[in-house]
Design a protein with these regions (language model features):
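Bacterial Sec-dependent N-terminal signal peptides
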Residues: 1-22
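Accessory carbohydrate-recognition regions in carbohydrate-active enzymes
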Residues: 21-242
Length: 242
C-alpha cells in the first residue's frame, strides 16, 4: 500500500512541475481552515474547526482533538487527535448532532477515545476546504480525507506491521453498529444530539472498504467483543483489522 501511494504522489508531482509555468491558483487555495481554531471554553474567540466539505454539502468532516461532547471539536494547541469526525456543528455553544468518528490504529488494539488518541504535528498536517491529511505519529499512519456532496473518501496508509485496525465510534446516547464482512461493509446509526431534533432522530451511516476484514470486533463502553457482528447499546462501536 505504501509503495503504491508513493508512486501515485510521484507522478502527481511530475505533472505539477511540468505545468508550473501555466499554473493558475484556484481561489479556494487561499482559504486557511485553521483560522479561528485557537480557542477554548475559557477564551471563546474564533470558535471554528477545520471543516472539510463540499459547498452546501450534507456532511462536514474534521479531525477531533476534543473529547466526545466537547463543543470545541478541534483546538489548535491540542497535541492529540482522537478520531476523524462527521459533524454538523454550527457553533461550540450549540454543539453537535449527527456525529460519529473513524480512527486508524496499529499494534495493540485500543478503541476508547482516551487510549486511541495519537500525537500529531501541524508540520505534518495539510488542511484545505476540500482535502485534509495528517500523520499520526503514535501509529506511523497517514490519513487523508476528501469529500463529495453527501459522503467522504478516506485513504489510510498503514506501515508494514502485524496489526492494522480502524475504529468506528458511533458515540453515546443510543447507537447501533453492524459489521458485514461478506461485503466489506459497516452500517449503523448514531442518535447523539444537542436538542432541537425530532424524538426519532437517527443519523445513519454506511462505510465501504476496499479490502476484506481480517478481524471483527464490536464494542460498547469499554467492553470489546470479538466476532460479535451486531450491537445496540448506549455507546457502541466497531473495530476491523487488516
Amino acid at each position: 500500500m505504501r509503495k503504491k501511494n508513493l508512486i501515485f504522489f510521484g507522478l502527481l508531482f511530475f505533472g505539477l512541475a511540468a505545468n508550473a509555468q501555466n499554473k493558475i491558483l484556484d481561489p479556494v487555495d487561499y482559504v486557511n481552515p485553521l483560522m479561528g481554531t485557537q480557542s477554548v471554553h475559557s477564551l471563546s474567540n474564533g470558535n471554528t474547526y477545520p471543516a472539510i466539505a463540499r459547498p452546501w454539502g450534507m456532511n462536514f468532516w474534521t479531525p477531533q482533538t476534543g473529547e466526545m461532547g466537547d463543543g470545541w471539536i478541534y483546538t489548535y494547541t491540542a497535541e492529540k487527535i482522537r478520531g476523524f469526525k462527521q459533524t454538523h456543528q454550527p457553533s461550540p455553544w450549540m454543539n453537535d448532532y449527527g456525529q460519529f468518528s473513524i480512527m486508524p490504529v496499529t499494534g495493540k488494539l485500543v478503541f476508547t477515545e482516551q487510549e486511541r488518541a495519537s500525537w500529531f504535528s501541524h508540520k505534518a498536517e495539510i488542511v484545505k476546504p476540500y482535502y485534509y491529511s495528517v500523520y499520526l505519529a503514535d501509529y506511523d499512519v497517514t490519513t487523508e480525507i476528501t469529500t463529495t456532496e453527501r459522503a467522504a473518501h478516506f485513504q489510510i496508509t498503514f506501515p508494514e506491521n502485524e496489526q492494522s485496525s480502524i475504529v468506528i465510534d458511533a458515540f453515546d446516547k443510543g447507537s447501533y453498529i453492524k459489521i458485514i464482512p461478506s461485503e466489506n461493509k459497516i452500517i449503523g446509526y448514531t442518535t447523539r444530539n444537542s436538542e432541537g431534533v425530532p424524538d426519532n432522530f437517527k443519523n445513519y451511516f454506511v462505510l465501504l472498504f476496499d479490502k476484506p476484514f481480517a478481524t471483527n470486533y464490536t464494542w460498547h463502553d469499554k467492553i470489546l467483543e470479538k466476532n460479535k457482528l451486531e450491537l445496540t447499546n448506549d455507546h457502541v462501536g466497531a473495530v476491523v483489522g487488516f
